[in-house]
Amino acid sequence: MFSIVSSRPKSLVRPNSRSIVLPALVALTSIIFSKDNRLADKMESGKLHYKDVNSTFNVDKPYKSRSKPNYPGHVPLNAFEKLLMMAGSSIGSYLHPERNEFIVGLGESTAFTPVLRRLQRQMLSDPVGRQILRERPRITSESLDLDYLRSLPKNTIGSAYIQWLDREGVSPDTRVPVRYIDDEELAYIYQRYRECHDFYHAITGLPIIIEGEIAVKVLEFTNIGIPMSGLGGLFAPLRLRPKQRERLYGIYYPWAFKSGLNSKPLINVYWEKILEQDINEFRRDMGIEQPPDLRELRRKQKKLPEPERENAN
């Protein structure tokens, strides 16, 4: 008799499926999230793995790159940044006219290219203007021999200039370099205008007190056309006392308009070359009248009886 051998296989031990699936999921998750974490780290540091220079997704480069400076000290600004600077400096200049940084910012942000191009054409059409653009002189205490100016006769431009500097306690070195005008030559033209400002005070005798500054600004605007000067003449008097506005509107504005419109272009004056010239002769040649002494008018106002000098400065 044959023994019957069971065909049933022997029982095998089945592994727990969870013991395989769970570690696999953990490993897969670790791989995925580890990669995501590394990617996030690179995104945070600005270093993604797109190294193809032709790739449009290469974010190693900044999202927006600033233009390269066109000259030493130049700070390129886009249109929105210039608009913000103009708005902020306008408010700052009105509230704090003594703060030079607001005046500087307002001047450069409103020095529109068409205005400077017009001045450029004006200079290029004049022999002296062309010489200034070619040589690009700077008005500083180093370029001007201040001790020599003190030795000049009292009736000369150089003597009037140094006397005005000493009387007002200012220096030619107080004019900061232009930074926010993009074109190099236009930046120099504005720098030249800025550095010549004290000569306009000197030939007119106007002091640096607020009324004198406003009067010179109106003269500059009517002759040179710098927008900031016009804005100063328009809005600065609003902060003055009634008597100060009366002096400006009644005496110095008519003088500034007449002299500015009748005078030859002040931007074409090579001041460094005419320091020994008679100042009265210069005024006649240019067509500039000397205004009344502002400080003397203020002194007379203060000597008036109290009811008559009400609101005087």
UniProtKB/Swiss-Prot annotation:
<comment type="pathway">
    <text>Cofactor biosynthesis; ubiquinone biosynthesis.</text>
</comment>
<protein>
    <recommendedName>
        <fullName>Ubiquinone biosynthesis protein COQ4, mitochondrial</fullName>
        <ecNumber>4.1.1.130</ecNumber>
    </recommendedName>
</protein>
<dbReference type="GO" id="GO:0006744">
    <property type="term" value="P:ubiquinone biosynthetic process"/>
</dbReference>
<keyword id="KW-0456">Lyase</keyword>
<keyword id="KW-0862">Zinc</keyword>
<feature type="binding site">
    <location>
        <position position="201"/>
    </location>
    <ligand>
        <name>Zn(2+)</name>
    </ligand>
</feature>
<keyword id="KW-0479">Metal-binding</keyword>
<keyword id="KW-0496">Mitochondrion</keyword>
<comment type="similarity">
    <text>Belongs to the COQ4 family.</text>
</comment>
<dbReference type="InterPro" id="IPR027540">
    <property type="entry name" value="Coq4_euk"/>
</dbReference>
<feature type="binding site">
    <location>
        <position position="197"/>
    </location>
    <ligand>
        <name>Zn(2+)</name>
    </ligand>
</feature>
<keyword id="KW-0472">Membrane</keyword>
<keyword id="KW-0831">Ubiquinone biosynthesis</keyword>
<comment type="subunit">
    <text>Component of a multi-subunit COQ enzyme complex, composed of at least COQ3, COQ4, COQ5, COQ6, COQ7 and COQ9.</text>
</comment>
<keyword id="KW-0999">Mitochondrion inner membrane</keyword>
<comment type="function">
    <text>Lyase that catalyzes the C1-decarboxylation of 4-hydroxy-3-methoxy-5-(all-trans-polyprenyl)benzoic acid into 2-methoxy-6-(all-trans-polyprenyl)phenol during ubiquinone biosynthesis.</text>
</comment>
<feature type="region of interest" description="Disordered">
    <location>
        <begin position="290"/>
        <end position="313"/>
    </location>
</feature>
<feature type="binding site">
    <location>
        <position position="213"/>
    </location>
    <ligand>
        <name>Zn(2+)</name>
    </ligand>
</feature>
<dbReference type="Pfam" id="PF05019">
    <property type="entry name" value="Coq4"/>
</dbReference>
<dbReference type="InterPro" id="IPR007715">
    <property type="entry name" value="Coq4"/>
</dbReference>
<feature type="binding site">
    <location>
        <position position="198"/>
    </location>
    <ligand>
        <name>Zn(2+)</name>
    </ligand>
</feature>
<dbReference type="GO" id="GO:0031314">
    <property type="term" value="C:extrinsic component of mitochondrial inner membrane"/>
</dbReference>
<feature type="compositionally biased region" description="Basic and acidic residues">
    <location>
        <begin position="303"/>
        <end position="313"/>
    </location>
</feature>
